[in-house]
Amino acid sequence: MQDLISQVEDLAGIEIDHTTSMVMIFGIIFLTAVVVHIILHWVVLRTFEKRAIASSRLWLQIITQNKLFHRLAFTLQGIIVNIQAVFWLQKGTEAADILTTCAQLWIMMYALLSVFSLLDVILNLAQKFPAASQLPLKGIFQGIKLIGAILVGILMISLLIGQSPAILISGLGAMAAVLMLVFKDPILGLVAGIQLSANDMLKLGDWLEMPKYGADGAVIDIGLTTVKVRNWDNTITTIPTWSLVSDSFKNWSGMSASGGRRIKRSISIDVTSIRFLDEDEMQRLNKAHLLKPYLTSRHQEINEWNRQQGSTESVLNLRRMTNIGTFRAYLNEYLRNHPRIRKDMTLMVRQLAPGDNGLPLEIYAFTNTVVWLEYESIQADIFDHIFAIVEEFGLRLHQSPTGNDIRSLAGAFKQ
């Protein structure tokens, strides 16, 4: 550089002092930086953005939205300034040290931001594909960003103080306890995110139920430290990511994948209405298409058993059909012939233990849809029919006395 200044002095016939030469050098570096900035940002990047917006290629639009090339351009500008500082300024001078340090800090910062943009581009592209969109990549990428920011921060500090990064890293060992306390949630969240992804425990869109945190809805975001759940009342519940590994939760995605949703509901039968069927009732019920095969086979089985016993002196020696058993058989056939009930999954009508509320008769079946509205409609239609048909079997539903029951009882006493 000094040779160049000497040649300028000889040609111009003037003497240039040190201050003037430094002003000239910094002016050249500044003008070069401005020209490079104009070329990159006003010409190259604007042209690229216009073509990306007009293009139908998704990856070009995502790159533009995340400003990946903008940050790469700033990184390139820092590299050019650093090269000029090495070329124009004498090594070891204060001006050279200051300018190269600033340029290197600039390069580190924008290189880190460029990596952040690249990760965002990968994440946005992954979310466009069904298979990759189900993975909790956001939390993993946030963890990578955190680690990258810490490493670059160490490099920048070591550059400013003029020490090796190894010295700083070795000094961090004494602060491990403090760092673990400060970065507890991010570290636990990163580990939890990897476990959730590796074990396929949770994906975006899954129906999650976690009563401890009041969460019951669809997962809309899996981050480094938190998981967001949109509840069915449209409220948002935030759950610490690590709690999904340390605590238990219910994931309904298996139900959605199976294509069938369970109906498990019981009705209470008044036990005082349970009795044997007489001949007239059997003949009337035999007209039902769903019951006819059952009544025929059951009647033959009972008659054969009674014939073998040969004793008809007491009802205790005989087998007879009951209204509750016939009703249970009817419900079983009704469900098996229902067009919206899965026949390849568990299907049964069973008695539960009787109690103060009568005899519970439970319907256990699966619908052929997992859509909530359709499921509720199918379930309601089934129980509407059950409530309406129960009296045909001489049975009564059990319920606690209502105001109407009390008024009827009071009217009976008045009479």
UniProtKB/Swiss-Prot annotation:
GO cellular component: a single term: plasma membrane
Inducing factors: Induced by growth at high osmolarity.
Keywords for the protein's UniProt record, in alphabetical order: Cell inner membrane, Cell membrane, Membrane, Stress response, Transmembrane, Transmembrane helix
Main location: membrane
Periplasmic membrane side: 1-24, 89-104, 170-173
One annotated GO molecular function: identical protein binding
Result of altering residue 167 to T: Gain-of-function mutation. Confers sensitivity to high osmotic stress at alkaline pH. Causes morphological changes under high osmotic conditions. Does not affect the channel activity of the strain
GO biological process: cellular response to osmotic stress; response to osmotic stress
Effects seen without this gene: The deletion mutant still exhibits an occasional MscM-like conductance. The null mutant is not sensitive to hyperosmotic shock.
Topology in membrane: Multi-pass membrane protein
Cytoplasmic side: 46-67, 126-148, 195-415
Transmembrane regions: 25-45, 68-88, 105-125, 149-169, 174-194
Pfam family, one: MS_channel_3rd
Keyword Translocase in annotation: no
Key word Iron present: no
Compartments, as annotated in UniProt: Cell inner membrane
Family stated for the protein in its record: Belongs to the MscS (TC 1.A.23) family.
Main function: Functions as a component of a mechanosensing system that transmits signals triggered by external osmotic changes to intracellular factors. Probably plays a crucial role in cellular protection against high osmotic pressure. Also confers protection against mild hypoosmotic shock. Overexpression confers protection against severe shocks. Lacks measurable transport activity.
Quaternary structure annotation from Swiss-Prot or TrEMBL: Homoheptamer. The long C-terminal cytosolic region interacts with intracellular proteins like FbaA and HldD.
Protein name (Swiss-Prot/TrEMBL): Mechanosensing system component YbdG
Natural source organism: Escherichia coli (strain K12)
